[in-house]
From Swiss-Prot:
Pathway: Alkene biosynthesis; ethylene biosynthesis via S-adenosyl-L-methionine; ethylene from S-adenosyl-L-methionine: step 1/2. It comes from Oryza sativa subsp. japonica. This is 1-aminocyclopropane-1-carboxylate synthase 5. Transmembrane segments: none annotated. Gene3D superfamilies: Aspartate Aminotransferase, domain 1 (3.90.1150.10), Type I PLP-dependent aspartate aminotransferase-like (Major domain) (3.40.640.10). Catalyzes the formation of 1-aminocyclopropane-1-carboxylate, a direct precursor of ethylene in higher plants. Belongs to the class-I pyridoxal-phosphate-dependent aminotransferase family. One of its GO terms (molecular function) is lyase activity. It catalyses: S-adenosyl-L-methionine = 1-aminocyclopropane-1-carboxylate + S-methyl-5'-thioadenosine + H(+). Its EC number is 4.4.1.14.
Amino acid sequence: MIMSGFHIGIYTSICLYIPLPHLEPWIISSHTPKNLNLLDCLLYCSVASYTAIAYKFCTARLIQSERTRENIMGGKLLPAAAFAGSAPPLSQVATSAAHGEDSPYFAGWKAYDEDPYHAVDNPDGVIQMGLAENQVSFDLLEAYLRDHPEAAGWSTGGAGAGSFRDNALFQDYHGLKSFRKAMASFMGKIRGGKARFDPDHIVLTAGATAANELLTFILANPGDALLIPTPYYPGFDRDLRWRTGVNIVPVRCDSANGFQVTVAALQAAYDEAAAVGMRARAVLITNPSNPLGTTVRRKMLDDILDFVSRNDIHLISDEIYSGSVFAAPDLVSVAELVEARGGDGIAGRVHIVYSLSKDLGLPGFRVGVVYSYNDAVVTAARRMSSFTLVSSQTQKTLAAMLSDEAFAGEYIRTNRRRLRERHEHVVAGLARAGVPCLRGNAGLFVWMDMRRLLLGGGGVGGELRLWEKLLRQAKLNISPGSSCHCSEAGWFRVCFANMSLDTLDLALHRISRFMDTWNGTKQQASCQQQEQQ
């Protein structure tokens, strides 16, 4: 029996649309080759039928693999829930609640995303005051790139540092030498030349988030603990715990001394960890502090270094706002103290995190730094940095920018002045509204005191109810202190550098209006109480 591929193709195609019981008589009577006996015809039809069935099966498998959730008939995607029941379980990391996305810190962001303020399109929307982003000096960066287009561009022919080929191919995972050298110089410059940094001890990461997590992986094992003074950056719950399995033990500080950490508080946290079987592996501080907007005093830094040495643990100093200190006292970097203490053996315990997200206002570039005086830590960090690389083009552009001494110096001075002016503007506006703030000298935020407004008997519950009112009524996303693990309820972090001055003034007006409403309600309640008496 001889059958052409043409015939099989026709029969296969027809079988896709016509049920086989109706199809086979039609094939036999009308479209079988001539001079075939009955057996040949039966074989012929069987081949065509099974070819069609096989085609159907293979097509179904192909559709399932390449268009898993697509409804072919309707051209629509089926809901993910339709497939979830048959899927095997995910890992403990994937399903862990340690990410902290249920925190008010992240919930406020979601509320903003659903109803973002826009001066024209949505003037009654939520104003984002929960994002520590520096946009006050973006014009300086844009002007530099406009005047130096070669920094961000490349040539399309040949090879060399400025060529497309050189940027596109694999680079040293440790980072471009030119960029590490420029970064080391910039880190020293923003500290007033009081500390020096070795480019060979710099390990690049995709932002400070990756740098902090990388150090946690290196210094601690799952089940160990990091000691962190409160209040602290809400993202640490995600960055340090979620994937590492490491615990955070809060070092409780309070407003009596401006939330400055004390040796007694450090020891209490260390003992608390030991009491539940957790081994403390490091103290992590932010200097300048997020969310306080303050710097750590030299005496306290010395005390912390003595504490980690005495207890044989490490110190991580997150200094991503080190170039954003705009008022006295000046920043004292732990790098200064390491150099001053010389050969007392402390250097191997000290690790610094830095980033260009805050001081340079470039969070989208994802550039972070692990700087360690410990060679073993540097080696381990380099090995792990392959999971969190910075693109060659980003490094090339920033190497040119930071190597320009005149530009870098002018940027630092202008940015500090603008941040100081913004800070003073916000503090004055809040004071007019009757809201005091902790005295700050750094960062992109103020630490606002609304303890007297606490609802429902105070405490964290009262703070969250107040936060909800600020979010839903005043349409302001402001981070509550409880999301920063503050030991006192009623404090809020207010960011001021991520918006225009007009938007900031509107936000201050909304706070003032909110306070007027609260004062009126309080006065009315007081009058009613007097009448009852």
